[in-house]
């Protein structure tokens, strides 16, 4: 189906006749939930109890075996203090690896035996009927507007092709603070609304509570009119097939509050993004199937590409503000985990649908961009430590919090483990051992380890890390259709080797970045809310050197320290040291954009691109004018329909509260009143003043009056809502 947008010459009044900027209010109460009291909720019976017992027992047995072997390595001459530290760190890290391995093994098994969805979704069955009213919500914050709207429109066209489009309404919920982005969003909305009804746009003047507050604001204003809502990210694309199927599953299962799909990374252009794309495509389904199998009705929510029962969300997921100062207090950052836990506490089932195809997202183009996003997630996940003791949570929900915290604490733990290992070697090499301590002892203390057993422990640990990759590869190779979708068995095998090599090089650097993030958070540094970079990944050389100086210096220090101790220690630490020493060249290599189709690490979406992704590109090109101005005020002055739409949309902004003064708006009013011309006033206004002017109808009209030819039109424009 061709991408369709409004003709550029069509007046905005025609668009307003087809679709109001916002629908009529349908308020729905969303009370803040208490963490100190457990609500009364119906019990949820899950068939996953025996599955969880199996997973936990297998993890415990595997962990005990690994820890015992490590103890045997260290106890040859008695456990010293440093060896005790190493043993404790190893126990925690090995248990983490063991749980991941057992869960992946479960995923391999259930996919081999044939996955059966707990909510009855049939990926290849006939298209089900849907009678419920569904809202598609796209929260956005300072993103590239033409691309964001193109993704939404491509998703909409795919839904319309199923014949179920009448059940869906479409909302763009903007929290953008950049004036140019704000006006560009309105321009794109006007283009699409001219030919498509049930498309709505709302801009919040104050982005209270960030994304979670954006969704909560919509629920409280419009949620009463809808049965379900689908949350998208700015980089999300979903096919109509998957949307209709998860909506039908929600109708069939009245006690299900949320179904999370498995988003597949697409549109990767840099080598780093391609590694993430390939890894997610080949390993992701098996890992997700394993977690879905034993999480059951206590699965998790990842914040996007998921369908939610609006009444359940409103009644159970109102987020409280955490006591204390940032970064651990204040607004809950990683809200998705918490919302899922609260909904499950409220008696609603939370499910993951790992086998549905047609749910897509994109990946940061570079390791630095990935680390910047990871920094926010790290703070949000560590914040969950305050929620572990919340009353009434299911133990699996608490486990989600623990695993989220552990995902970041394991980085400094691995680093501490490496440092402790070096110190033990230094102690053995340079410190004269005290064979006979001051206290009475019948036997001397020999600082010694068992090198042969240590090698076996290392090999076993590496096996647990690598074997899931091989199992996922095996799943592809034994299925002829899947093998062809990845480009053939040989290319897939080569892709796994290349992905493993690049991941091994970047993992030590990510360990340093995550360790730094944890330390910063513990020192009280807040991550803020930065714009997600989704470009081509190009980073200036000076910035690369500056940002990767710490990992490189750490690698050099480790290399020198290990070399001074012994060659065997240096060889033992080579995988980590090489990754750190090559941090800068690997960073430059992995941010390069490849224009040609790659030979290795290809995914099904690259071999046979879905039509919906091609539509995104076509729509984005049509929504982006060739001579677009970046000045939002000039855009309003030169475009009558855009000006009318903006003034109409301001009618939906909440009125200013008496006694609350916006200093930027007050400054703008003084500057505008003092100016003798539009160009003079516009030149005096800074970005914050421009944003304040754009959000105040009266002040904006005073500025437009100065533009002469637009004066009467600007003043005479009335909101159509």
Swiss-Prot record:
SUPFAM superfamilies: Nucleotide-diphospho-sugar transferases. It comes from the Bacteria. GO terms for molecular function: hexosyltransferase activity. Its EC number is 2.4.1.-. Keywords: Cell inner membrane, Cell membrane, Glycosyltransferase, Membrane, Transferase, Transmembrane, Transmembrane helix. It holds the Pfam family Glyco_trans_2_3. Involved in the biosynthesis of osmoregulated periplasmic glucans (OPGs). Pathway: Glycan metabolism; osmoregulated periplasmic glucan (OPG) biosynthesis. This is Glucans biosynthesis glucosyltransferase H. GO terms for biological process: glucan biosynthetic process. The chain crosses the membrane at residues 54-74, 85-105, 404-424, 458-478, 493-513, 548-568, 569-589. InterPro entries: Glucans_biosynth_gluTrFase_H, Glyco_trans_2-like, Glycosyltr_2/OpgH_subfam, Nucleotide-diphossugar_trans. It is found in: Cell inner membrane. Its main location: membrane. One of its GO terms (cellular component) is plasma membrane. Belongs to the glycosyltransferase 2 family. OpgH subfamily. CDD domains: Glucan_BSP_MdoH.
